[in-house]
Design a protein with these regions (language model features):
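Alpha-helical bundle regulatory/interaction domains
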Residues: 1-55, 62-63, 67-74, 83, ...
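Pre-recognition alpha-helix immediately N-terminal to the DNA-recognition helix
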Residues: 44-49, 92-102
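DNA major-groove recognition helices of helix-turn-helix
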Residues: 83, 100, 133
Length: 156
């Protein structure tokens, strides 16, 4: 049976925490380009509201997101399951880990600063979740994904 509802992916709604990134054009010229922070409409008011909370308030706990929205957490989780095709907890963790990956690759923020920015209870909690889900430690990820001259390429 054909799917009636198109699933919304994290790639469609993710917002980078960076302020600007350097872009190199085909002619070799470069500029620092603003990174947009506007919510890209997903077609769902629920999803757009959740993404706004995730990005601007950095809240990643289902109960806290539901409280901010003034809705029942179970109903919100059910709606998110329908919209994304995955449990809300998985969606929140993937979104949050995307932020962590970008902070590790593009900034010199310490792991404890990143943990605080991404609503982890501690640096060790972030390290544990990151290593389990991504398959390497945050330090190893940073070493293999961050440009040596990252400050030239990114502003945060």
């Amino acid at each position: 049976m054909e799917e009636i509802l198109r699933k919304i992916t994290i790639d469609e709604v993710y917002i980078s925490p960076l302020k600007r990134r350097r872009v190199r054009w085909e002619d070799g010229s470069e500029i620092m380009e603003e990174v947009p922070h506007a919510i890209r409409p997903s077609g769902s008011m629920i999803m757009d509201a959740v993404v706004q909370i995730l990005f601007f308030r950095r809240v990643f706990q289902i109960n806290n997101v539901a409280r901010i929205l003034g809705v029942d957490p179970v109903k919100l989780a059910g709606a998110m399951q329908i919209l994304t095709g995955m449990p809300m907890l998985d969606f929140l963790n993937i979104f949050r880990l995307r932020l962590v990956q970008e902070y590790l690759a593009c900034t010199d923020l310490s792991l404890s600063q990143i943990a605080e920015c991404c609503d982890f209870s501690s640096q060790s909690s972030l390290s544990h979740v990151f290593t389990k889900e991504i398959g390497c430690s945050p330090a190893a990820y940073r070493r293999s994904h961050r440009y040596r001259d990252f400050r030239f390429w990114y502003e945060w």
